């Protein structure tokens, strides 16, 4: 075994569906300044208020989608890890979570102790955001520096418009899209508008435009999460040959009262049902592995909302997970990182 490891990093999950474990996980997640970007005292107060009721609510949601093997996100990321071993001859393939276990700092320490000297760090997020990519890279660099680990890090960059990533989406989703359906909704995880605006100070970038990055500079496109989501969706629809009007984009998982990027998924579900859509397909391309946001928020609550609004069937298209084409594509992208 050589000294070059591949480290696949995903968001994370509570250790169990107990309220205590969910509270611990939510506290770690929400206290990350890249997630809740407020001054520490304000962030601590806000998170403390959220943790009064949210852990019990979230524990119920996790319990509704929990597998016998554990958290779907962790289980699916481990399956991806197992498949990637055959495609990475340079050293060990490991996984880490930004929040929860296996914790990123401990995994880096273990790799260094095993004699690894190079690590290709693969944040499993197609689109760029501070709350996903930046926080992973920052924690990895901080860990290496503070613990004096003899590790050289390389980072897989966001791949939202990489042709092979789009091909993997097509290969994974094609069996569902070859069936009859009325509309395809591509639902991405949402972000507060301020997360994007602070990355483009002085820019007149319109985050509510139908194509917000149409005339944007390369610097703005590199940090505009919304524009990258729209680009992923457009590339996928074009590659699949889905006509305009039969697909649309929305953003889910809004938390709090701040303005988030639009349109909101819950709004689109009602609009599509009332417009006459009976069978709705929903894809969530911001996630490469199914998780609470896909299985519970869309697959359960979203389906219930759509049917109550007049629709008849909502089909959740699985994420890439450990699809063979995705495994091959990810391996090639990591080789070139």
From Swiss-Prot:
GO cellular component terms given for this protein: cytoplasm
InterPro entries registered for this protein in UniProt: Ferrochelatase (IPR001015), Ferrochelatase_C (IPR033644), Ferrochelatase_N (IPR033659)
Alphabetical keyword list: Cytoplasm, Heme biosynthesis, Iron, Lyase, Metal-binding, Porphyrin biosynthesis
Broad class of enzyme this protein falls into: lyase
Top-level taxon: Bacteria
Classification via Pfam families: Ferrochelatase
Subcellular location: Cytoplasm
Binding-site list for Fe cation: 189, 293
Organism: Pseudomonas putida (strain W619)
Functional pathway: Porphyrin-containing compound metabolism; protoheme biosynthesis; protoheme from protoporphyrin-IX: step 1/1
Keyword Ribosomal protein assigned: no
Family, per entry: Belongs to the ferrochelatase family.
Protein name, per record: Ferrochelatase
Main localization (coarse): cytoplasm
Single Gene Ontology BP annotation: heme biosynthetic process
Catalytic reaction(s) noted: heme b + 2 H(+) = protoporphyrin IX + Fe(2+)
EC number(s) reported in the record: 4.98.1.1
Annotated GO MF terms: ferrochelatase activity; metal ion binding
């Amino acid at each position: 075994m050589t000294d070059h490891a591949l480290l696949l990093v995903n968001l994370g999950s509570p250790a169990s569906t107990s309220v205590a474990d969910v509270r611990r996980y939510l506290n770690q997640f929400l206290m990350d300044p890249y997630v809740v970007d407020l001054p520490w005292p304000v962030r601590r107060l806000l998170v403390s208020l959220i943790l009064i009721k949210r852990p019990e609510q979230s524990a119920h949601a996790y319990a509704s989608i929990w597998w016998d093997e554990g958290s779907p996100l962790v289980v699916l990321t481990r399956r991806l890890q197992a498949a990637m071993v055959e495609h990475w001859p340079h050293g060990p393939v490991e996984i880490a979570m930004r929040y929860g276990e296996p914790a990123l700092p401990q995994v880096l320490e273990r790799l260094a102790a095993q004699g690894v000297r190079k690590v290709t760090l693969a944040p499993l997020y197609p689109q760029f955001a501070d709350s996903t990519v930046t926080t992973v890279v920052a924690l990895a660099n901080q860990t290496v520096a503070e613990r004096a680990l003899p590790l050289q890090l390389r980072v897989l960059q966001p791949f939202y418009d990489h042709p092979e990533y789009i091909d993997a989406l097509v290969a994974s989703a094609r069996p569902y899209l070859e069936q009859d359906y009325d509309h395809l909704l591509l639902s991405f995880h949402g972000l507060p508008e301020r997360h994007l605006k602070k990355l483009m100070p002085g820019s007149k970038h319109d985050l509510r435009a139908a194509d917000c990055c149409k005339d944007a500079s390369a610097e703005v496109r590199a940090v505009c999460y919304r524009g990258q989501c729209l680009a992923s969706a457009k590339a996928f629809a074009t590659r699949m040959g889905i006509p305009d009007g039969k697909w649309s984009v929305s953003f889910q998982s809004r938390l709090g009262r701040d303005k988030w990027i639009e349109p909101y998924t819950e709004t689109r579900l009602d609009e599509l049902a009332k417009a006459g859509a009976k069978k709705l397909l929903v894809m969530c391309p911001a996630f490469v592995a199914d998780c609470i946001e896909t299985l519970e928020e869309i697959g359960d609550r979203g389906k219930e909302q759509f049917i109550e609004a007049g629709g008849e069937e909502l089909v959740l298209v699985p994420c890439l997970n450990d699809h063979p084409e995705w495994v091959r594509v990810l391996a090639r992208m990591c080789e070139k990182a």
